[in-house]
Regions:
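DNA polymerase processivity clamps
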Residues: 1-120
């Protein structure tokens, strides 16, 4: 039961995640902080290598939900999703994100677990 539902172009979100992930490495791991807002998601990551930020357009209202993800897990789910646009169903910053096709088909369903974020 996820009250927050947004739609996003798979390629656009993958590209945003890729740009933000440049500061993340095997030695310097950090979650990607996602702030879902109305019509956009703000992505950021901070490590000893520096800080990276990006914005990706979405359809829907993320209700200011802030959630962290391991960049690899979220990127893998999006990379293997056989759809140009996906639906992300969210609830809280500590509950899983469910990724499904926008058209309502049942070709895939990915569940990505969040990472607890430290206060900024």
């Amino acid at each position: 039961n996820n009250p927050i539902c947004v739609e996003v172009e798979t390629k656009a979100l993958l590209e945003s995640l890729d740009r933000v992930s440049v500061v993340i490495s095997e030695k310097l791991k950090s979650p990607v902080r996602c702030l879902f807002d109305a019509d956009r998601v703000y992505l950021s990551a901070r490590t000893g290598n520096g800080e990276a930020k990006d914005i990706c357009p979405i359809s829907g209202d993320g209700q200011q939900l802030e959630i962290g993800f391991n960049n690899r897990y979220l990127m893998d789910a999006l990379r293997y999703a056989p759809a140009d646009k996906v639906k992300m169903q969210l609830n809280t910053g500590i509950s899983p994100c469910i990724i499904t096709p926008v058209d309502g088909g049942d070709e895939f369903l990915y569940m990505v677990l969040p990472v607890r974020l430290k206060a900024q």
